[in-house]
Every structure is written in C-alpha cells, then in structure tokens.
Amino acid sequence: MLLKLLQRQTYTCLSHRYGLYVCFVGVVVTIVSAFQFGEVVLEWSRDQYHVLFDSYRDNIAGKSFQNRLCLPMPIDVVYTWVNGTDLELLKELQQVREHMEEEQRAMRETLGKNTTEPTKKSEKQLECLLTHCIKVPMLVLDPPLPANCTLKDLPTLYPSFHAASDMFNVAKPKNPSTNVSVVVFDTTKDVEDAHAGPFKGGSKQMVWRAYLTTDKEAPGLVLMQGLAFLSGFPPTFKETSQLKTKLPEKLSSKIKLLRLYSEASVALLKLNNPKGFQELNKQTKKNMTIDGKELTISPAYLLWDLSAISQSKQDEDVSASRFEDNEELRYSLRSIERHAPWVRNIFIVTNGQIPSWLNLDNPRVTIVTHQDIFQNLSHLPTFSSPAIESHIHRIEGLSQKFIYLNDDVMFGKDVWPDDFYSHSKGQKVYLTWPVPNCAEGCPGSWIKDGYCDKACNNSACDWDGGDCSGNTAGNRFVAGGGGTGNIGAGQHWQFGGGINTISYCNQGCANSWLADKFCDQACNVLSCGFDAGDCGQDHFHELYKVTLLPNQTHYVVPKGEYLSYFSFANIARRGVEGTYSDNPIIRHASIANKWKTIHLIMHSGMNATTIYFNLTLQNANDEEFKIQIAVEVDTREAPKLNSTTQKAYESLVSPVTPLPQADVPFEDVPKEKRFPKIRRHDVNATGRFQEEVKIPRVNISLLPKEAQVRLSNLDLQLERGDITLKGYNLSKSALLRSFLGNSLDTKIKPQARTDETKGNLEVPQENPSHRRPHGFAGEHRSERWTAPAETVTVKGRDHALNPPPVLETNARLAQPTLGVTVSKENLSPLIVPPESHLPKEEESDRAEGNAVPVKELVPGRRLQQNYPGFLPWEKKKYFQDLLDEEESLKTQLAYFTDSKHTGRQLKDTFADSLRYVNKILNSKFGFTSRKVPAHMPHMIDRIVMQELQDMFPEEFDKTSFHKVRHSEDMQFAFSYFYYLMSAVQPLNISQVFHEVDTDQSGVLSDREIRTLATRIHDLPLSLQDLTGLEHMLINCSKMLPANITQLNNIPPTQEAYYDPNLPPVTKSLVTNCKPVTDKIHKAYKDKNKYRFEIMGEEEIAFKMIRTNVSHVVGQLDDIRKNPRKFVCLNDNIDHNHKDARTVKAVLRDFYESMFPIPSQFELPREYRNRFLHMHELQEWRAYRDKLKFWTHCVLATLIIFTIFSFFAEQIIALKRKIFPRRRIHKEASPDRIRV
C-alpha cells in the first residue's frame, strides 16, 4: 500500500510541468549534503573530538604526544612577570620607599639619633648635581641654636660637636624671617662624627650636611660673603700646598685660607674681607693665570636641603629604563611552543599588568592578578617575589603538577615531563651551590658532627646543633698547634685562614662535594685531587701514587706531598667498606671503585703523623677480606736556610717565610672594573705564584722597649682573634723593618750561622725538597722505610670512607706498623698553568676562630649566582639600603646602643633568607648540609606545596606580609624541594601485613609467617627466631581482648599451623601485638614520603648579563654552541652605562636568532593591546556587558512595538481565538409569568 502511494506521488511529481527540474535539484542537494556531512564527521573525529576528549591532545599544540608521554597527566605553566616601565608601578615603588624611610626616621628619633641621617644608598642618591658643588665640613641646624649659645656652650648641647671651630646664623632663602645655624669644623672626619653622633635629650632638631656651589640659579641658596671659589687652574694640582705656592701675589694677599678640592677641580677661598670679592673678580678679568691657565673667581652659595635639586636624581633612581625588560617573556613563550608543546595551559601572574603584545583571545593563556591568589588581601600591594611565589599554587584551574618559570628562563632544547618527574624515581631535583654558612667560618658540615666548634657556638647555628651543650663534646683539633709559637725556637706552624682552607679545597668547591658522583668543575683542580675521581683519571698522573701490594701494611708518603691516591688494583676487585682514624690532617678520603683507587687529600703544612685505615675489599672471586694499613704523612715543606751578616740586627734575621695568595677569578666582571689590581709575581719551582713576605726571626730581648711592647700587643691581638695570621705576619714584618732598617733587603746566603745570643751552635737546615723535581719526571724507583714494630691504638673516632655502598663501623683501630717496601711513582713534574694556579694551603685551627669572612669569599659551584628574585627592583637592589638600615636600627633598638660603636654591616637579603629557611629545616628535619636549587624551571606539586605551608603556617604568613624581599622570607624553591626530600612517611603496620599476606586472605599462613620472620630478623634465620615470633603472637592472643584480635570472626579451619596453639594470625592481632610491632619498627626504617633523584648541572646554563659587550657576546655564543635544556639570562645591565643599548641590542638579536617564529600567544607586530592593566580591561568589559544588555533590551522593545503596530488586528483576532470571551446569559425574572 505504502509502495503504491510512493509510486503514485512520484509519477505525479514527474508529470508536473517543473517536476523533472525539482527532482534533479533534489538529487544534487542530496549528494552535496552527503559529502558535506561526511567531511564534518571526519574533521570532528580527528581534531575537535580529540581536543575535547582526548587528554593526549589537550595541549597548546593541539597534537597527540602519546608516543612520547608516559601518562596523559595535564601539566600547566605558571609565569611571574612584571612590567618595570609602568609609571603607576614606579609611583607605588616610590611610595613604599618613602614609607620605609618614614618608619626608619621614627626609629632614629626613638634612638635619639639624627632623623635626617641618610642611609648609605640614600646619601648617594641625594647627590648634588649643581656646578662645582662640593660637600664642606659644615652642619646646618634647623631650628637654629639659642641666641645666647656660644661656641663654648655648644658641646653641652651637642657633645659630638666638641670639635667645632666656628658657628654663625644665616637666613632661610624661602623664609628670610627665620634663621638656621651653621656650625663649621676643621676636618671632614670631625663633621662626619658630629653628624652621626646622638643628640642630648632626644632633640628633634634637624641637622643637615652643608654644600657649597657656584650655581646661583638653583633654588634654596644662600650667598656666603666671605667665601669664594677659584677655578681654571691646571688639573695637575692634587695638594693644597702645590696650588698655594703657585698663586699670584695679588690673590694670595687677600685670602686667609685655601682648600683644594681636586675631584671638583676647584679651590675654596676664605677672604680677609667680605668685600674683597669684587676686587678679586676685577683682577682675574685682567688675565690672572697659573701655568698659562686663566683663573676664574666665582661667588660661593650655601645649600643644605638637596631634595629639590636632587629630584632628577631620585627620578632616575626609579626611572623606567632602570627596570626595563627585554621582552624575555615573549621569547620564553616561543621556547615553550617550540620545545615543550605538551603543556596544557599557561598562567601569567602579574600585579594587574598586561603585556602589550599578548593575545588575550587565546584560550590557552590566562592573566592572573595578585588579588586572585592572595588569601589575605591586606598584604597587597606587594613587591616581594617570595610573597608572590608562596601563593601561585592557589591559581584556580591549575593542574596538580605545574611548571613554574620566571620570565628570564626559557628552554634551549626539547623538554619532556620526565625531565622534571618520573613515576619510577620521582621528582628530579637540580642542586647547585651550598647554603651560605650560618656564621662566619662555620660550614654546614661542622654542625652537629660531635665536635664543639667555636665558630658555630652561637644562636645563629643553634649552638653547633647541640654539640656545644654540656661538657661531653670534644674539640675538633688536638693540642699542639698554635698561631704564635716560640719565635726564637725555630720555624713554627703557620695556619691559613679558616673557611677557605678547611671547608673548601678550592674557590667554590666544598670538601663535601668531593666524591659525590658528580663532576664539579670547581673541584676538577689539583688542590681538590680532581674531584677525587669524579671527573675521570686523565689527571691522576699529577697526584702522588702509591700502589697497595699484598702483605704490606705500612706505607710512607714523602714529606710535602698532600695529594695522593692508593691503587688497590693488584690486590682487590672493589672496595666494600672503609674507615680511617680521626686526624685533623685529613681533608677527604674516599674509595673510587670505578678506578680501583683510594683517594687521600690532606691539608698542607701539617706535622708528621700516621693515618690508620681499616678496609674491607673484594677479590676477583667476590670473597671479602679485610686489611689494616698505616700511612705516614708529613705535609710540611722543608724550612729554608738561615744566614748571617756582620751587623748587629742582621745577625738576628732568619729565612723568609712565603705566604701564598691566590687570585680569585671573577669571570662575569669586566676587566676594567676589577679592583684592586693584582700585581703578578714570579713563578716558583712548583709553578705557583707566591708573595714573599719577610718575617725576621729576632731575639726579642735585644729590641728596644717600644718594639717589644708593640710585638706583645700583636701577639695578644692574634691570640684573641682580633687579627688573622696573615695580618699578624704583615704587621710584624713592617714593625721589625722599621727597627732593623734596610738590612733585611740584603741578599741572604744559605749557610750555617752561630747564634751568639744563646751560645749554641745550630745545625744547618736541609735544603727544601721540591715536589716532583724535573729530574725525576717519568722515573720509577723504590725506596725502603723501616720502623720498629709497635702497637698503636687510635683513640679518635673512625670516619667512614664512602664507596657505594657505605657501611659504617665504630671499631677502633689497633695495628702494628711493620717495615715494608713501598713503591713510589713520580710520573711528571707539576707545572700548573697561570690560568689555574692554586695557593699552597695551610692548616688553620678553627678553635682560634681565624676564618675568612663569608662576605668576602662566598664558595660556590660553576653555576653559583646570587639570584635575588624575578622582580626588576630586586635585581637592582632598590630597597637593599633601607633593609640594611632597618636591620641595623632594629638591632640598636633591641640593645639600645650607640650605632657609632655597633656599626652597620651590609646584608645580603637573599643569603640571609636562605640561612633563615635552613635553620627552620634544621629544627624540623635535623641538621644536614644543603644546597640551593638551580635557577631554572621547577615542577611543583600543589598538594606538596600545601602540605609545606600547613607545616609552617606562621612563616609563610610572615613571608606574604612582607612588602619587599626580607631576610626572613621562606624561599620558594629551596623550602619546597627540601621539604619534598626530607618529609618522612611513618611506617604503617597494616601495610607491612598486606605485603606479607600474599594470598590476601586476611590471615597469615605458616609460609607467610616465615616471610615476616625474615623481614624482622637477620639472616640466616634460626629456629629460635621463628618460634620466638610464634610465641609472641600466642601470648598476645591470650592477653588481648577478643574484640581487638577479632579471632572469633575467623573460621577455625581457614589456616592450619604446625603449632596447634598458634591462633589465626589476623591483621588486628599483628597490629596490636606490641612485641611484634616493636620488631617491625626496628627492622623497617621510615621511608621518604616522596621519591626524588638528585641531578647534575649539565643541562643548565645560567648567565649573568652585565654591561661588557664582548663578555656578553661570549656568553651568548657559548649557549649557541652548547645548547642546554634550561637557559637563564639574568639581566644585570647597568642601564645608565654607555654600552647598555648595545648590550640590549645584542641580547635581542640572540633571542631572535634562537626563536624567530612568533608564537600563538602573540599579537601581530602591527597590533597591541588597548589596555595594559587588568582593572582597565575589567572596567571596559563591565561597561561592554552593560551596554550590550541595554542594547538588547531596546532592540527587543522596538521589535515588540513594531509587531504590535503592523499586526494589531491579527494579534487581537488570535487572542480572541485562543482566549474566547464567555457570554453572560441573564436569567429570566421569576416574577414574569408565562402566558
């Protein structure tokens, strides 16, 4: 029926006049629609579908990386960025600085100090920029001194003004009815002391430094009638006396005093008569000259308030160019699109700023303001990078694991998630240089090591981690070495400076870095034994080699050798365990199984001693055997010859003592800016540079009384630690030279001498033996040392050598020394090239506190850089002077002392914050040596970061509160990674039970009980161990109540045991049986909560970009030649330098050469964003939405009105049809009668 109907309709359509055309068009439309539908389906399934539902394609590239990514784990990128050229930002910075200055002014007022005293940077900032403007020894007081106050009364009001030579009043230039007092001093030192001194009774009087200038156009000047400036004379005059002798007679007769200011090329004249200026001015116009140069006399104007004339300098201090960036964020985004296209979204955290080139329409990029992430909005605005970083994990919609970058960090090669994290090994942590010491001369490895170290015995180091509490702690070094010694009794021990020679074998290489399985470039030098084998064996020929032979236990290292290694290739295949006796001569000892060597690196300049080793080795058959060896060492150099002369004092002279001094390389500092200039000296026989400081040995009793007193004072200062040994030697040498005259300069011949003062004939000293003389290059020889057989017991603690694995032992060593033959190999003479020469290091006694200050030598690796933060004002240290001043004032408030005596010590806020966090971590996780994470992209887990902040809520809240970077900030990467590496997962007994319960039955069988016994007992397992465990379980089942053990719920036939008394071993029974849980806790150690892996520095390139063009070009070319995965170009350009523009052009050219293709996140070059602040954009969007809403309302009203106007009748008819009216029928009246 249906088919006939369809056939009839078809015939009807075809029989129609246009039926054929309609059918043709219908067929074409059907075919085209089919193709269109198929294309849409295909396109949807390939791209749109996968982008929306396929997690492998949910990234900025929109492509699948399934063949490279292990898991479809979404990873976002978070940037922190700021536009340093924003005028609103610069105003806010200036306001914060002024607020800090106000607070410090109030603190000075509390301390009774001068409220106008500038900080170190402020004084430089308020620079007088007028013509011939000089700072003179005068102070200006406002309000003025009392009218009856005389010069004699002045010290009673201001004790620090006792050196004043004159005083007078002058009228204020802007208010002539009021005066200010001017106090004159003779010298600059007197005026500085008076300006820095406290005021009696907390006076609020303003005290200013006075300036004189010839620029009469500046505001706030007062003409000085009796003073004048002389200029135009040759600049060769550097002393006042030189200029005074050259003055013409007409000029010199009219002046009282003359003071030359050579730095300004002017001289200040004090005239005899205030009216004499007009006469001098006329005379100078009549061609008054000095050496052909025409002189000029100018009036002198007094000023004191520099705020008006120095406004331009202040504006320059916070100018846009100072904080200008190089569009690093643009190129960093390009690097992500090129080398890390697998990231999902990009979040840019700003203070509300928007990059002018950023494409805000891209759905993959989002601007996040500080208001969106800060929990406490009262902490805003903030200008502290740690405060901002502590909140970035709170970004809404952020992935659990995200990568955090600064805008100056980019990728140089393809990067994948497993460069940051792998599921098998966990988080990859990239560490660089060690945390700065908690105190000067106290490395982190000394804290809580069982020895009380004087340098660490302070609150900053937690009293050496507890080593100095009580009387049980031992001192690190044995007695017998002193810094002074008996001068007349022969050559004494000389100690070097503390941290550089004890804790660091080379500049930037800590002893703890040796043999750590990473080749550290700073350690790959001779003085560090070439990183104890970590950097290969190419330079082993420069070390002293000793071959260990079977049946030999006594070895001797020649005198003066302190870099040696022992080869055990002839007696063993690998080292298993090793300990050595406690001896201060040892700097480092370790086993390198890869090279079959034992490395022994010692301190130079130490007395002869014997080191005992207890080694456990493996032979070729994997059989372990133990050997005990004794090594005699003496790292002192042989003393030089004495000599005699005929003069009285010359007979007291002894050989000179060389004091080496190393050149510290500053690779990133231009040569023209390196100061002081180091003078090169001759190279000695060992190829090292050394400076000859002659220290005469004299009989003290023959010197004058004055010399004896001064020498005793020097000895006392050295004993108290006021001066270092180097300073002691230099001072003593200079002192003796002043009494001995030039006799020390005569050439001293090596020969025997007779000490007539003592009447004893001294034996001539041997010539010092040079290390590896040229005559023995490549030569092999054998020598025999014989010692009497004796037993020596070492009472010091044993140190574990560190072959992998390291097994600790506390056994004491007792080994007889036997006479044996030692094979000595001298392979090549040591010739150190000048580029890598090293000092001869000498041992120092830390108990005396002779340490090199950390501020002078900050040890670090090749990548060590003091990275102050990502914000430009942190890089330029804009607030550093105020932070230093605040720290000083807080210290003075705490003790209420005079700052003149306490002084100010400039701080490094970044280093102080590292010490602060390190101290917190020590208190929570124990004392250990820590290193600073590299400045590179970091993968952060939001959950881990939240756990860290939950553990230290007050510390992070304090960090968030700080407006600028503070010394008590929680450093973001440092605190995060060391929490991740230090957090411990408590042992879960239930988890141990499930591991042993392999059949998952909930009850342990006999086999599973044996497995548990092997886990908690040492192997081989004895019958007593197994039965003891069973008895523990039986006893617990009898003592514990049934509701805890839940034995009644177990079917009796589920498990059958050999011991019929053993109940079903359920999880409840095991977890509640204390003897068993104690055994498990003893056998199972707490594991790290998070897995991690320490990585090297091979893929990190950190470059500090400064203003030296050639140096910058070399740095960038190094990146071009050796591309790394993680590249950081830290901008430290001096934008006021003449080469700053060139450096920025070179940097921009480098960026364009590396990443020339614009990314999807950029607008075309001819476009820029209309709004550069989020609040402007949000206001515009709110206005747009409101306008759109009202526009739609008006349009809807118009449409409705139009419809009603044209279709009114139809609408009414439709209404009547849909809603018909009901007709009302009137009822008939009941009174009406129907007829």
Curated annotation (Swiss-Prot):
GO CC field: Golgi apparatus; Golgi membrane
* EC number, as in UniProt: 2.7.8.17
What does the record note as the disruption phenotype of the gene behind this chain?
Severe retinal degeneration, growth retardation and secretory cell lesions. Mice are smaller with a reduced mean body weight and length, along with a reduction in total tissue mass and lean body mass. They show elevated levels of serum lysosomal enzymes, cartilage defects, and display cytoplasmic alterations in secretory cells of several exocrine glands.
Q: Which cysteines are joined by disulfide bonds?
A: C438-C461, C452-C468, C505-C528, C519-C535
Specify the superkingdom: Eukaryota
| Pfam family membership, one | Stealth_CR2
Q: Which UniProt keywords apply?
A: Calcium, Disulfide bond, Glycoprotein, Golgi apparatus, Membrane, Metal-binding, Repeat, Signal-anchor, Transferase, Transmembrane, Transmembrane helix
Which PROSITE patterns does the entry mention?
Answer: DMAP1_BIND, EF_HAND_1, EF_HAND_2, LNR
Could you say which residues bind Ca(2+) here?
D449, D464, D467, D516, D531, D534, D997, D999, S1001, E1008
Ranges: LNR repeats: 438-473, 505-545
Q: Where is the composition biased (Basic and acidic residues)?
A: 837-848
Q: Which residues cross the membrane?
A: 22-42, 1194-1214
Query: Which Gene Ontology molecular function entries are recorded, alphabetically?
Result: calcium ion binding; UDP-N-acetylglucosamine-lysosomal-enzyme N-acetylglucosaminephosphotransferase activity
The record's section on InterPro entries has: DMAP1-bd (IPR010506), EF_Hand_1_Ca_BS (IPR018247), EF_hand_dom (IPR002048), GNPTAB_reg (IPR041536), Notch-like_dom_sf (IPR035993), Notch_dom (IPR000800), Stealth (IPR047141), Stealth_CR1 (IPR031358)
Q: Which reaction does it catalyse?
A: N(4)-[alpha-D-mannosyl-(1->2)-alpha-D-mannosyl-(glycan)]-L-asparaginyl-[protein] + UDP-N-acetyl-alpha-D-glucosamine = N(4)-[6-(N-acetyl-alpha-D-glucosaminyl-1-phospho)-alpha-D-mannosyl-(1->2)-alpha-D-mannosyl-(glycan)]-L-asparaginyl-[protein] + UMP + H(+)
Instruction: Extract the ranges annotated as region (Disordered).
Output: 751-783, 830-850
- Know anything about its domains from the record? The DMAP1-binding domain mediates substrate recognition. It specifically recognizes a conformation-dependent protein determinant present in acid hydrolases.
Q: Anything else of interest in the record?
A: Stealth proteins are part of a protein family that is conserved from bacteria to higher eukaryotes. Family members were first identified in microbes as proteins that help pathogens to elude the host innate immune system. Microbial stealth proteins are most likely involved in the biosynthesis of exopolysaccharides. Stealth proteins are predicted to function as hexose-1-phosphoryltransferases.
Name of the featured protein: N-acetylglucosamine-1-phosphotransferase subunits alpha/beta
What is the organism of origin for this protein? Mus musculus (Mouse)
